[in-house]
């Protein structure tokens, strides 16, 4: 909703976590003609899930240049909306290059990097790009998302990749934080009934 996706838009989503996947399935009913989503090698299962959620094309940024892919896939038109939920400063910089003039960039991922802003500003101004921050969804957006899920019977439960018992809450938090080798949850849940 924050990106203002409308009929026929080309949308790029940077980051295939639960926010990125949610943006993917929300973009189709909003009217997006093409939906692109990026990730890295370890995101392969998430990128496959993104295809089920409506992504037209997935992009492994360790193997392909996102700007080149977007130029090719849009016949040089570039994107109307880019949503960055990766929090990766390099992805944010690439995002601007994937947008055409007078388009919209939504930032929903925190970087902690104070050096990105000065580098972006001139491109945003010259290309008249609207910059929209997004920290959380409002009530209207949440209600709309729930309606979409209910009406389309969308398989959002497939985002849940790990379920932990209550007595493993610390392990769950470490897994989410990337501290457990070989464990890379898309969405993790705690089920107190498991122990």
Task: State what each model feature region is.
Residues 33, 78, 154-158:
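A local structural motif
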Residues 80-83:
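N-terminal Rossmann-like NAD(P) cofactor-binding module of classical short-chain dehydrogenase/reductase
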Residues 1-64, 68:
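Mid-domain Rossmann-like dinucleotide-binding core that forms the NAD(H)/NADP(H) cofactor-binding site
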Residues 3-5, 74, 86, 99-100:
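A generic alpha-to-beta junction signature in SAM-dependent methyltransferases
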Residues 22, 64-65, 72, 93-97, ...:
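C-terminal hydrophobic helical "lid"/dimerization subdomain
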């Amino acid at each position: 909703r924050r990106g203002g996706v409308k009929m026929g838009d080309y949308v790029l989503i940077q980051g295939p976590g639960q926010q990125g996947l949610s943006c993917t399935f929300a973009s189709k009913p909003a009217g997006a003609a093409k939906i692109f989503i990026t990730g890295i090698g370890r995101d392969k299962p998430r990128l496959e899930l993104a295809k089920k959620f409506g992504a037209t094309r997935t992009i492994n940024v360790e193997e392909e240049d996102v700007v080149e892919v977007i130029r090719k896939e849009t016949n040089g038109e570039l994107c109307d909306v880019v949503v960055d939920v990766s929090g990766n400063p390099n992805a944010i910089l690439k995002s601007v290059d994937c947008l055409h003039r007078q388009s919209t960039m939504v930032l929903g991922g925190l970087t902690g990097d104070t050096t990105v802003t000065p580098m972006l500003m001139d491109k945003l101004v010259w290309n008249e790009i609207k910059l929209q921050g997004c920290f959380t969804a409002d009530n209207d957006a949440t209600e709309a998302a729930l309606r979409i899920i209910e009406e389309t019977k969308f398989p959002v439960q497939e985002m849940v990749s790990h379920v932990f018992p209550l007595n493993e809450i610390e392990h769950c938090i470490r897994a989410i934080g990337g501290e457990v080798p070989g464990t890379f949850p898309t969405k993790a849940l705690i089920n107190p009934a498991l122990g």
